[in-house]
Amino acid sequence: MQLSVATISANDNDGDLLQYSLSGNDPSYFSITNQGVIAFNQPPSYFEKNEFSILINVTDNIVSITQPLTVFLLRVCSDSFLGKIVCFEEENTIIEYDRSNDYPTWQDWDGDCQSNRHEVLESEHIDDDSNHPLVFSSDGCFVNSGKWFDPYDNLYYFSSSEVQIDHVVALFEAHKSGAWSFPASRKLKFANNIDFDDLLIAVGGSSNASKGSSDPSDWMPNNSSYYCEYLNKWLNIKSEFRLSLDSDEREVILNLYQENNCQN
């Protein structure tokens, strides 16, 4: 197993011998050679600790330089399911879940005064109806009205107050499936990610409430013509973020795939 994580390059103009050392929060997990190669002392365990923060110190005994480094571990998945590389594992149903602290929504990542909720409302607005244009608040920070299609219930909505932003893989479902082990920064990104197209979708409040935190073994959209697209989104998210698929979930998804002639 390869334990090295990075190689630090430094030069001294006078040709003096450089000395490397580590400090910070987690130096005991690593070693660094005279050539600047940083490696784990022991094979790390993803579920025990997967974020490490260290300071790299370089000195010629006259001048010293310190550089921070954060090392993240990624979960390795090796199971194959319907063309996706995934993790087969049962849900962790005993791990504590605190949505408000671990997965706060909705952030304003680009500083334009629009939270990510309103970014999604803007991006998913259907601009084909002059009677229902996209209307913002006077300060431009909030979407008030427009036109949105809920593929779960096959319905249109025209007021943003009737529309909710659904995490296709609900936060509690993601948490039980492995997101519980994400570092805090990754939990925050997962809860607010508008860059991964499949993760968030604007739907009616009633369909979102009906779904709750269910996986496909307990809930599917009322609109059966959307089954295949929904399942593909689900699998894309589970694969991309290395979230596990439990046995009941896999069985139902496979049956639905076959019954509806889905293609990935």
Model-derived features with residue positions:
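A generic structural motif
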Residues: V71, V120-E122, V163
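Glycine/proline-rich, flexible active-site/cofactor-binding loop segments
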Residues: T93, R99-S159
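N-terminal module-boundary/linker segments of secreted carbohydrate-active enzymes
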Residues: V76-Q114, V120-S123, S247-E251, Q258-N264
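Domain-level detector of nuclease and nuclease-like folds
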Residues: W148-N264
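A short acidic/small-residue loop/turn micro-motif
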Residues: S45-E48, S123-E124, Q164
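Acidic, turn/loop-rich segments in luminal/extracellular domains of secretory-pathway
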Residues: M1-R75
